[in-house]
Curated annotation (Swiss-Prot):
Monomer. Its EC number is 2.7.1.71. CDD domains: SK. Catalyzes the specific phosphorylation of the 3-hydroxyl group of shikimic acid using ATP as a cosubstrate. This is Shikimate kinase 2. Keywords: Amino-acid biosynthesis, Aromatic amino acid biosynthesis, ATP-binding, Cytoplasm, Kinase, Magnesium, Metal-binding, Nucleotide-binding, Transferase. The lineage of its organism: Bacteria, Pseudomonadati, Pseudomonadota, Gammaproteobacteria, Enterobacterales. It comes from Enterobacter sp. (strain 638). PANTHER family: SHIKIMATE KINASE, SHIKIMATE KINASE 2. Belongs to the shikimate kinase family. AroL subfamily.
Length: 174
């Protein structure tokens, strides 16, 4: 598989964890767009959003997406990358998009276990369970629109990777 693989989904669905495992399984490079952007900017996402706003952050996110897209690369994207139609189109045209789908309860449980508050600024200012439910309701259709494959991410990272590898093999065989 030489095309980039883009992992999309909400906060807490496991894009980074699964992405690292998938890259190992596919003998590919791995890039997390949030991490790459923060390293390049020398600031956290929360700092960028606080000082420059969401619009500036989303523009930087688009630049990052294009900069890291390369053959034989697994790319964990930020949860909101699909908000821009041009990002959804870019990923679909230049690679394979996998939506890591999980129920709200699973996402909330993971986010409460690993809050990483500095990296994950609130999107709505509401309690985490309300925010996750609201954001997923707004974005689920966009994740599905962007995705070539939808994978249940409520399982272990190893199981999720196994399902992705199977889906990719079936896609290549057809």
């Amino acid at each position: 598989m030489t095309q980039p693989i883009f992992l999309v989904g909400p906060r807490g669905c496991g894009k980074t964890t699964v992405g690292l495992e998938l890259a190992r399984a596919c003998q590919s490079q791995f890039v997390d767009t949030d991490h790459w952007l923060q390293t390049k900017a020398g600031r956290t996402i929360a700092e960028i959003v606080e000082k420059e706003g969401w619009e500036t952050f989303r523009a930087l996110e688009t630049e990052t997406l294009k900069a890291v897209s390369a053959p034989s690369t697994v790319i964990a994207t930020g949860g909101g990358i699909i908000l821009a139609e041009h990002n959804r189109g870019f990923m679909r045209e230049h690679g394979i998009v996998i939506y890591l789908c999980a129920p709200v309860a699973t996402l909330v449980e993971r986010l409460e276990a690993f809050p990483e508050e500095g990296q994950r600024p609130t999107l709505t200012g509401k309690p985490i369970s309300d925010e996750v439910s609201e954001v997923l309701a707004e974005r689920d259709a966009l994740y599905r629109e962007a995705a070539h494959h939808v994978v249940d991410a409520s399982q272990t990272p190893e199981q999720v990777v196994s399902h992705i590898v199977t889906a990719l093999r079936l896609a290549c065989a057809s």
